[in-house]
């Protein structure tokens, strides 16, 4: 199943990006990752890819794979960024 999901080639990535993500999410992911220190970006990219692949592999219906994987990985990233910068929003 994962064989069908090809990683986004480095030449098509926006700077330091996760290995797997939906191309339509690239500007949003790039903007969120841009708020992080460079030392933390690689770790967050790996976590995003892991979240994306976990849901991709678990979803039995092929037409739902990208949608569910996007939702899960993007939600995790949004919550992480929100918690990380919550102290500045008070």
What positions do the PLM features span?
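C-terminal alpha-helical interaction appendages
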Residues: 2-90
């Amino acid at each position: 199943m994962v064989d069908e999901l090809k990683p986004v080639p480095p030449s098509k990535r926006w700077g330091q990006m996760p290995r797997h993500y939906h191309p339509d999410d690239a500007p949003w992911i790039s903007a969120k990752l841009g708020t992080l220190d460079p030392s933390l970006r690689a770790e967050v990219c790996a976590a995003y890819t892991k979240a994306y692949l976990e849901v991709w592999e678990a979803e039995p219906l092929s037409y739902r794979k990208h949608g569910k994987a996007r939702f899960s990985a993007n939600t995790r990233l949004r919550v992480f960024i929100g918690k990380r910068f919550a102290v500045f929003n008070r």
